[in-house]
Amino acid sequence: MAASSSYMACAKFSMLGWLGGRRELKMRRVISVSPQEQAEVQESQEVNAQEEEKVKQPVQPRPVEPQVNVKSKNMGREYGGQWLSSVTRHVRIYAAYIDPETCEFDQTQTDKLTLILDPTDEFVWTDETCYKVYSYFQELVDHYEGAPLTEYTLRLIGSDIEHYIRKLLYDGEIKYNMNARVLNFSMGKPRILFNNDGQLQDV
């Protein structure tokens, strides 16, 4: 499957820089614990840590419900009319809702980030590898939750995804699409296996 695909994630970024308001402080709870309870808590934490290591799986991408009658809308003046995006060779991230059928951009929905993966079809993607990238994208969005929604933050997410795609390529999970319109091998020369001794050699 050599086609570009997109995924949307709901983002909870801070709008502090845009709105000029004060960031709400989260209330912190203080809990006092006796020494006996601390020992019980430590034992339960060790058991939980062991279970987490066994079951560590990629983050499930949260589905975003499709919307009907989406119209292209620009940002309002209260946000400075900014077009927030991060565009790299293989990853495009927009702070907007993009209708997957009509490709209408609704920039007013800045609580959604849309990922467009490999728009030039440079790689051959399977459903499993696309899912891995979308899961990693969801992890990054969750990691940057609360950070200011700026182009810098989106570029950080985009560059991390580029590195992850390079890792998938070097691990052999994806490969170059030799039927692509342009063969430029942007992530290095293709590697092939000689003599099956387990070492990859450059072409």
UniProtKB/Swiss-Prot annotation:
Subcellular location, principal: plastid
Cellular component, GO annotation: chloroplast thylakoid membrane
EC number: 7.1.1.-
Region annotation (Disordered) ranges: 34-61
UniProt keyword Transport, yes or no: yes
Transit peptide start-stop: 1-21
Subcellular location: Plastid, Chloroplast thylakoid membrane
Membrane topology: Peripheral membrane protein
Composition bias type Low complexity, residue spans: 34-48
Record keywords, A-Z: Chloroplast, Membrane, NAD, NADP, Plastid, Plastoquinone, Quinone, Thylakoid, Transit peptide, Translocase, Transport
Known catalytic reactions: a plastoquinone + NADH + (n+1) H(+)(in) = a plastoquinol + NAD(+) + n H(+)(out); a plastoquinone + NADPH + (n+1) H(+)(in) = a plastoquinol + NADP(+) + n H(+)(out)
GO molecular function: oxidoreductase activity, acting on NAD(P)H, quinone or similar compound as acceptor; quinone binding
Function: NDH shuttles electrons from NAD(P)H:plastoquinone, via FMN and iron-sulfur (Fe-S) centers, to quinones in the photosynthetic chain and possibly in a chloroplast respiratory chain. The immediate electron acceptor for the enzyme in this species is believed to be plastoquinone. Couples the redox reaction to proton translocation, and thus conserves the redox energy in a proton gradient.
Family: Belongs to the NDH complex subunit M family.
Subunit text: Part of the chloroplast NDH complex, composed of a mixture of chloroplast and nucleus encoded subunits. Component of the NDH subcomplex A, at least composed of ndhH, ndhI, ndhJ, ndhK, ndhL, ndhM, ndhN and ndhO.
Identification of the protein by name: NAD(P)H-quinone oxidoreductase subunit M, chloroplastic
Source organism (scientific name): Populus jackii (Balm of Gilead)
